[in-house]
A protein has these predicted regions:
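Alpha-helical transmembrane bundles and membrane-interface segments of multipass inner-membrane proteins
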Residues: 1-228
């Protein structure tokens, strides 16, 4: 019997499913076993800090929550279609794998926004969150908060007094608290910039070919229907 070949499309799906599973397992474990704001010290440079945010990766926020959630869904759809085009055009495996990492990371945070407000009660510093009947949670659809937990204060020092605006203040690198999905997005983007710049130069051409193929397919279907 012939062994089933690992196609790039199948690899992309495996990466997406694996990242989503790991991300959600970590988030649900943290949310249902820690109080909001609770911190667990693993080493001097690695903590599990349970926080929630309404914004983008690493807690950033600069637009209304509902708009951000919709834009995330649009971005995931566009990247997903682009991965389909790259696979069909037999793009490099590493490029497809990194694209899958990025779209999986984005999808992981969107899942929080879509469903966590519907299936969990609100997190609190005084008690641990738990599952509730669907639709009776702390927020509406697309309005849930993203769960973050990884904190890596690798360098903790103080700005010299002569530094303008920051002199004498504490400096921490790396201060943002993030989750596994954020890490997958960041690692995917960095590796893509390092190893896939030539692949990225053809993004526009790939989309154009995909759109042209869609138009051609529709015209063919229309002609076939007229012939009938």
């Amino acid at each position: 019997m012939k062994k089933a070949q690992m196609t790039d499309g199948r690899l992309a799906w495996i990466i997406v499913i694996a990242i989503l599973a790991i991300d959600q397992i970590i988030k649900i474990e943290v949310k249902t076993s820690m109080c909001l704001g609770e911190s667990i010290r693993l080493t001097d440079w690695f903590y599990i800090n349970f926080i929630e945010n309404k914004g983008m990766a690493y807690g950033m926020s600069f637009m209304p929550k509902i708009l951000l959630s919709v834009l995330r869904l649009v971005a995931i759809s566009v990247i997903g279609w682009y991965i389909h085009l790259v696979v069909r055009e037999k793009g490099r495996t590493i490029y497809i794998a990194l694209l899958a990492m990025i779209v999986a990371g984005a999808a992981g945070n969107v899942i929080d926004c879509m469903f966590y407000g519907l299936i969990f009660n609100a997190s609190s510093p005084f008690y641990v969150s738990y599952f509730v009947p669907f639709g009776t949670g702390y927020a509406d659809f697309l309005m849930g908060k993203v769960v973050d937990m990884f904190y890596f204060p690798l360098i903790v020092t103080t700005w010299p007094q002569w530094v303008p605006f920051f002199g004498g203040e504490e400096f921490i690198f790396f201060s943002p608290v993030f989750n596994f999905a954020d890490a997958c997005i960041s690692v995917g983007v960095v590796l893509m910039l390092l190893f896939c710049r030539k692949d990225m130069e053809g993004i526009g051409d790939t989309f154009r070919r995909g759109l042209q193929l869609k138009v051609t397919s529709k015209e063919t279907v229309s002609d076939d229907e007229q012939d009938k």
